[in-house]
């Protein structure tokens, strides 16, 4: 369970002794450094971020999988040179780095070198090395909601800002994706995000709002479309979808009505049918 810090584990950790806490990827670099020397390891990478980094590249790219790249590689190189670009000629929209609590970066960030400081400065992080690419068919409000669902499930519940704050943010995102959002919801999301970030005990809560803050920063127009226009530009949020029968193509055969499980389709005359939106199954 997380606890207030300081003291940090490096000062007082296991059994009250100084303790090193690192992930497996960091520890895996130790044998190479001992064998080849620090200078050899530091010859690769950037001034402040040495060596290589393993990314789990996924999402809307042609080549998915684990890739090891030198620090300083650009996001464009990662997506297009290594990942093979976006399938089906779709347009790139965003890349989310760092795992579930990382931020979403946009086209203007593609030529920035990948290192620890650079990603943080742009509202994301290196984290566990996740890299999820999104194209024009992704709804960024739905993306933020997806990651917030995961973060809520993973919260240990010890500190109130994370336990309660993430749930409130998820409730707001759910409300927006269902067409019930208000402009005040955007203000509350930003305020809650900063509160959770500043007052949570561990890194999960401190970074939990990254998906929300970054999408609000770069894709506020999508939030506004959900709230003001009651539409999802990417056509992902099912509660904001409406269906209609193309009267120019309908011949009035009513074959479609026979297969509708809720009788949402009614025949009006010999040449047309009508769709009752109140009966639609979403």
Question: Residue locations for each model-derived region?
Answer:
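Short amphipathic, charge-patterned alpha-helical segments
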Residues: 72-87
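Terminal amphipathic helices with adjacent charged low-complexity linkers/tails
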Residues: 86-121, 217
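Cys/His/Pro-rich metal-binding microdomains
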Residues: 157-160, 203, 251-261, 274
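Short glycine-rich loop/turn motifs
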Residues: 51-56, 128-130, 262
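Ferredoxin-type iron-sulfur electron-transfer modules in oxidoreductases and energy-metabolism complexes
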Residues: 1-6, 113-242, 247, 267-270
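Short flexible coil/turn linkers enriched for glycine and charged/polar residues
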Residues: 61-63, 125, 239, 250, ...
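Single conserved hydrophobic/aromatic residue that forms the stacking wall/gate
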Residues: 271, 275-282
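Hydrophobic alpha-helical positions that pack around
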Residues: 1-71, 83
């Amino acid at each position: 369970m997380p606890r207030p810090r300081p003291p940090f584990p490096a000062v007082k950790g296991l059994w009250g002794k100084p303790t090193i806490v690192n992930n497996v990827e960091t520890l895996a670099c130790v044998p190479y450094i001992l064998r080849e020397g620090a200078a050899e390891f530091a010859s690769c990478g950037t001034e402040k971020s040495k060596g290589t980094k393993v990314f789990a590249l996924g999402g809307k790219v042609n080549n998915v999988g684990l890739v090891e790249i030198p620090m300083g590689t650009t996001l464009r190189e990662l997506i297009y040179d290594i990942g093979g670009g976006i399938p089906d000629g779709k347009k790139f929209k965003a890349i989310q780095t760092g795992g579930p609590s990382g931020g979403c970066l946009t086209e203007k960030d593609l030529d920035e070198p990948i290192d620890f400081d650079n990603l943080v400065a742009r509202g994301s992080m290196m984290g566990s090395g996740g890299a999820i690419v999104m194209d024009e068919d992704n709804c960024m409000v739905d993306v933020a909601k997806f990651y917030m669902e995961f973060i809520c499930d993973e919260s240990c519940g010890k500190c109130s800002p994370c336990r309660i704050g993430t749930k409130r943010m998820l409730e707001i995102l759910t409300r927006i994706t269902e067409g019930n959002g208000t402009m005040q919801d955007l203000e509350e999301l930003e305020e809650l995000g900063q509160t959770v970030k500043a007052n949570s005990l561990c890194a999960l809560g401190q970074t939990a709002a990254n998906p929300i803050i970054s999408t609000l920063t770069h894709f506020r127009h999508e939030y506004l479309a959900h709230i003001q226009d009651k539409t999802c530009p990417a056509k992902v949020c099912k509660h904001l979808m409406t269906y209609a029968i193309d009267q120019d193509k309908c011949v009035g055969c009513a074959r479609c009505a026979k297969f509708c499980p809720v009788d949402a389709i009614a025949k009006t005359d010999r040449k047309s049918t009508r769709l009752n939106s109140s009966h639609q199954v979403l």
